[in-house]
């Protein structure tokens, strides 16, 4: 992640804007708001989560984000999210690095 390209991550994130907001205070759309998602407790923002997401424990740490973004329906069977995933390792790393910047206090890199 330290060498990830944040600008490329922002480009990858454009696939997500139809369903997710990225700005502080913007609120949820079809999917939950992704501002400050890194290290946030799963299923913790104001959103109508599926039972699959409500059952998830822990935080959206780097490992959890990586696994979820690779194959959302494998990570959370029964999720309402229809996106098939970001299969390229580099694209996922870039996207996660970009998501990390969407915070007033970005989480430390692993």
Ranges and model annotations:
Residues 13-22, 95-99:
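The canonical Cys-X-X-Cys-His
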Residues 1-2, 18-21, 48-49:
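N-terminal post-signal-peptidase region of extra-cytosolic proteins
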Residues 18, 26, 91:
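Short phosphate-engaging motifs
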Residues 1-13, 110:
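Electrostatic cytochrome c docking/interface patches
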Residues 6-10, 24-62, 80-85:
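Gly/Gly-Pro-rich "capping" loops immediately C-terminal to redox-active cysteine motifs
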Residues 61-110:
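C-terminal capping alpha-helices of c-type cytochrome domains
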């Amino acid at each position: 992640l330290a060498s990830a390209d944040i600008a490329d991550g922002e480009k990858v994130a454009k696939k997500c804007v139809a369903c997710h907001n990225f700005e502080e205070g913007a609120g949820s759309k079809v999917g939950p708001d992704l501002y400050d998602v890194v290290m946030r407790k799963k299923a913790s923002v104001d959103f109508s989560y599926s039972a699959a997401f409500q059952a998830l424990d822990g935080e959206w740490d780097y490992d959890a984000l990586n696994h979820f973004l690779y194959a959302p329906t494998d990570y959370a069977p029964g999720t309402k999210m229809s996106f098939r995933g970001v299969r390229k390792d580099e694209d996922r790393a870039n996207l996660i690095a970009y998501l990390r910047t969407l915070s007033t206090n970005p989480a430390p890199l692993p």
